[in-house]
Amino acid sequence: MRFLISSLLSGLALLTSLHAFVLALPREYSISMSNPFHESLFSCPAASWPRVKLGSENTPQEPSKDLRKILSQISPKRIETTIRKLVSFGTRHTLSTQTNATYGIGAAREWIESEFQRYANASDGRLTVKVVGYDQQADGNRIPFPVRISDVVATLKGEGDPERVYVVSGHYDSRNSDPLDYKGIAPGANDDASGVAVSLELARVMSQRDLPRPKATIVFAAVAGEEQGLYGANFLAQSFRNSSTNVEGMFTNDIIGSSTADDGTKEPHVIRLFAQGIPPLNVENQAMRERRIMIGGDNDTPARQLARFVKETAENKHTDMEVSVIYRLDRYLRGGDHRPFLEAGYPAARFTEPNGNYAHQHQDIRIDKDPKTGKDIQYGDLPEFCDFDFISRVGKVNAAALWNLAMSPGMPRNVRVNTTALSNDSKFSWDPPAGGNALVGGYEIVWRSTTAPFWTHKMDVGMVQEATIDLSKDNVVFGIRARGKNGERGVAVLPFP
């Protein structure tokens, strides 16, 4: 008993000493006694090092008047109508009939084309529509017999830099539990009528005659063959590559239909954006890859720079969404149509809902037991499980990103940092974007700490193609971006030695 009392008194004395120590700390080291292991105990004034008084804070870019108008016109009701119409075709399996007027993927394709064409007819020639495709032979996997793969493509041609292209897509094919069942019902409301609905809605709104034309070209696509092996997207990406098209960004919207997880958790104001790290070897060879890793550039690939741009321009009160950038190609065991674009050498990223509910993806329509709870639940990718307001907000995120991309200058080329001599400053050089300097109002150097995910600082260096900054290249990550004549920011590019 005496030992217990002695131990308690010793412990009390220790806590009293700790409290006195905390009270004596300078303000910058202060911690809360309700949380004595507060993180500031392990921090110090040097935590923000390197401390520099250069440039300014890199704040989010506010949407322009034209963009605010676009965002205000994206309609949840139209999106719902599109999804229900696509579901009405019974199945949109890539192998399903292409000759039936009301059932199967052929009927769905013709309806999508007619909708794009309807918007084109109202656009005063701004929007053009075509169906492109090829005959895919049996692949010994999910294509057991030859089939026509068709993509529906609507193009809003830019005015100023029309050779620079941005692509947004959703896949209109669907499947149920059996990836080879091309006769059974496969509604595909979320996967991926939701993504197609966004492509259609953005084409409708952005092609209106009372809006200015974008500077760059925007392509709105509905592709097939995704569930069977990303065939339609691969065909589209390779078509762009074979024609040397300058695609500076691609987004796929795949499974963006629900804000509710399988446990009922709701995240109605969050969208995930998956962005790949190290590019495929066919895009950057081994020597280039080793060089990127050597300079710590594995987190500054074109796809991740594109994702940073989305975060900076599309996360605001007008979209009412948080863009959760995931530094990963895709979810585990899943794939998407951004991958063929990445493999073709284009920056690309995938939007997808915050939490998956696998009872409503790739499932036969049925009532069955929930393996977790044992209760009967409805299986199947049905419209009743879609959140149309959520989809419209995802559409707004896409619209904000695409419009800002298409109205800003393209990416600077041949961006370099001088490493010929040891120094504590950083000297950069670059060439204008592929479209030249016609849309450029100046250039900015941006930077962040090596552990920060997004740009934190910027410095406007004017209409130049080289600049030196009094901040060591060893201590931060730099990027160079073009700025439009009205302040529109472009995508930053990592400088290589």
Swiss-Prot record:
Full protein name: Probable zinc metalloprotease ARB_04732
Q: What is the lineage of its organism?
A: Eukaryota, Fungi, Dikarya, Ascomycota, Pezizomycotina
Q: Which residues form the Fibronectin type-III domain?
A: 411-497
Which N-terminal residues, if any, form the signal peptide?
Answer: 1-24
Name the cofactor(s) required for activity, per the record.
Zn(2+)
Keyword Calcium set for record = no
State the family named in the UniProt similarity comment for this chain.
Belongs to the peptidase M28 family. M28B subfamily.
EC assignment: 3.4.-.-
